[in-house]
């Protein structure tokens, strides 16, 4: 608003106040029902086949580095996935971890019999390989599902815990050792293409100046910033913590390798080079 001298004004409608369900957002913005959306790419499985590589386990580092990687990816090898939209930015959250109501995960056997919420197709595939029963649902449904016993826990990043008071509903928190986190998932901040094209050159410049890798990096930094405070709240709520390492971590990574292998095969069947996409994503994160 400031940079456009009041010409660009946005109205926010959280919690799907304009109707529909979260998976419908990408169609709403493409069709012009809304002008801008911020959503999880994984809510529409199969819609963004290249970008979904960033859902794979043991790929992300921190959100700051991974967000810049995913933005560069979508500007280059993954551009086809978002060709129908004006991309403002694509970013990720900090690596997610496992949170349960009571049972602290210390080994592969501890997953058996647990109903755990997974946010994306790759995350639910990993949970299944680990022996858990995966349950898919958007983040706002996690708290009531925990309260009603629909799920025993979930895999989410620390940052969203306080927003839904999940630290009060889960007491056991398990992370993985090493520089690569258990998982992350891309968020899309995208705009209706026709709406963008209808703007004046000066207005477009304002949007362009506040888009791309710098915005993705800023978003990643914010997620990283709130990781520690959220963990502190869980500790104050009486939470117990464990970091998987050694033999248990090796077993979990074997299960993760199966998820990665299956994703590459699936991508190849779609006419993509799954191995190249995976190697590119990994290299961009390591830059």
Predicted regions located by residue number:
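N-terminal secretory/targeting leader peptides
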Residues: 1-64, 80-287
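Signature of the catalytic double-stranded beta-helix
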Residues: 68-81
């Amino acid at each position: 608003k400031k940079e456009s001298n009041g010409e660009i004004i946005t109205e926010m409608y959280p919690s799907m106040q304009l109707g529909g369900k979260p998976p419908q957002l990408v169609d709403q913005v493409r069709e012009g029902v809304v002008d801008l959306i911020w959503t999880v790419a994984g809510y529409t499985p199969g819609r963004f086949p290249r970008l979904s590589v960033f859902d794979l386990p043991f790929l992300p580092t921190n959100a700051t580095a991974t967000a810049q990687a995913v933005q560069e990816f979508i500007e280059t090898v993954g551009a086809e996935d978002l060709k129908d939209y004006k991309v403002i930015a694509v970013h990720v959250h900090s690596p997610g971890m496992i949170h349960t109501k009571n049972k602290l995960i210390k080994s592969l056997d501890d997953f058996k019999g647990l109903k755990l919420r997974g946010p994306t197709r790759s995350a639910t595939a990993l949970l299944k390989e680990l022996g858990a029963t995966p349950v898919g649902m958007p983040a706002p449904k996690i708290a009531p599902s925990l309260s009603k016993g629909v799920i025993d826990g979930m895999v989410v990043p620390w940052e969203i815990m306080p927003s839904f008071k999940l630290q009060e509903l889960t007491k056991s928190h398990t992370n993985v050792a090493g520089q690569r986190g258990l998982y992350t998932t891309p968020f899309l901040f995208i705009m209706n293409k026709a709406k963008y094209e209808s703007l004046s050159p000066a207005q477009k410049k304002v949007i362009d100046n506040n888009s791309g890798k710098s915005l993705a990096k800023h978003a990643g930094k914010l997620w990283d910033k709130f990781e520690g405070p959220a963990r502190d709240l869980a500790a104050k709520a009486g939470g117990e913590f464990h970091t998987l390492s050694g033999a248990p971590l090796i077993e979990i990574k074997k299960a993760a390798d199966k998820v990665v292998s299956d994703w590459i095969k699936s991508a190849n069947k779609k006419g993509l080079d799954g191995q190249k996409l995976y190697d590119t994503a990994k290299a961009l994160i390591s830059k």
